[in-house]
């Protein structure tokens, strides 16, 4: 029963669209009869357009690659140690990586394996 209401509605809507000017056929061109009319761009404009297109493509690919690598990235963190032994080892490493000038000028005299650790008690007099 609802089917009989549909064709009059369809015909009425097509008529309204035609009267409103929204329903027009596209102009027909013969593909073989007329020559291809391309947009006129100068050589410089074409090169600028090509550069812009390549730049956008590279930027798009870089964004996609960055999003893919974000999912699989593993960040490394150094263990932090603030005890005297760790700080001493860090300073010794820094001194060994710096030059001999720093070693000669700033190296403390009483540094070595006997300095760290447990010291013997001095006998009291």
From Swiss-Prot:
A molecular function GO annotation: calcitonin receptor binding
SMART domains: CALCITONIN (SM00113)
Claim: Coiled coil is one of the keywords in the record: no
Presence of keyword Heme: no
InterPro entries given in the database record: Calcitonin-like, Calcitonin/adrenomedullin, Calcitonin_gene-rel_peptide, Calcitonin_peptide-like
Localization (cell): Secreted
Protein name per the record: Calcitonin receptor-stimulating peptide 3
